[in-house]
């Protein structure tokens, strides 16, 4: 496994201050086991981006998923369930605005630069409405390119027309 792809624990944890302690335990166990989000996600039948969002407290595990994740990571699932079980709800929207992390800032910048253009094209193709982030799948792929590998992001969101009344 190359250094660039080795699972790690993020070094700056200030933006995790409002997350349950279980989130930190999940990241540490993932790094200790040397597993990727994709490997863990497959164990519970989820996508790697969804699983990463759940680690960051932005998506909600079921109790069965918490038990399986605990088994895969070798950590006590009873502690995970007690912190992230059916009584817990995500507080979505993590981090400062504007973002300070370079990767997250570039995603933010892409919406600042291309947001209105994307919106206009969505309206031309679908009509007056929005793309759901609730009913959405996100995929991250690596695309080889002679000028340097590229990041291919796919947002597969359900179109929701605005209601008329």
Swiss-Prot record:
EC number assigned by the record: 4.2.1.104
Disulfide-linked positions: none
SMART domains linked to this entry: Cyanate_lyase
UniProt KW keywords: Lyase
A GO BP annotation: cyanate metabolic process
GO molecular function, one term: cyanate hydratase activity
UniProt keyword annotation of Membrane present: no
Enzyme class, spelled out: lyase
Catalytically driven reaction(s): cyanate + hydrogencarbonate + 3 H(+) = NH4(+) + 2 CO2
Entry-linked Gene3D superfamilies: Cyanate lyase, C-terminal domain, lambda repressor-like DNA-binding domains
InterPro entries in the record: Cyanase (IPR008076), Cyanate_lyase_C (IPR003712), Cyanate_lyase_C_sf (IPR036581), CYNS_N (IPR048564), Lambda_DNA-bd_dom_sf (IPR010982)
Signal peptide residues on this chain, from the entry's feature table: none
Family recorded in the similarity comment: Belongs to the cyanase family.
UniProt function note: Catalyzes the reaction of cyanate with bicarbonate to produce ammonia and carbon dioxide.
UniProt protein name: Cyanate hydratase
């Amino acid at each position: 496994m190359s250094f660039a792809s080795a699972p790690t624990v993020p070094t700056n944890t200030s933006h995790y201050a409002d997350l349950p302690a279980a989130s930190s335990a999940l990241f540490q166990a993932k790094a200790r086991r040397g597993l990727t989000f994709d490997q863990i996600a497959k164990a519970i039948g989820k996508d790697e981006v969804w699983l990463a969002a759940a680690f960051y407290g932005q998506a909600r595990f079921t109790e069965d998923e918490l038990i399986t994740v605990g088994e895969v990571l070798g950590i006590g699932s009873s502690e995970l369930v007690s912190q992230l079980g059916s009584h817990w709800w995500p507080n979505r929207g993590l981090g400062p605005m504007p973002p300070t992390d370079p990767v997250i800032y570039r995603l933010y910048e892409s919406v600042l630069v291309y947001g209105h253009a994307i919106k206009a094209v969505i309206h031309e193709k679908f009509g007056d409405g929005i793309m759901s982030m609730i009913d959405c799948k996100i995929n991250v792929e690596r695309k080889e390119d002679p000028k340097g590998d590229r990041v291919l992001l796919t947002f597969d969101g359900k179109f929701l027309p605005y209601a008329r009344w």
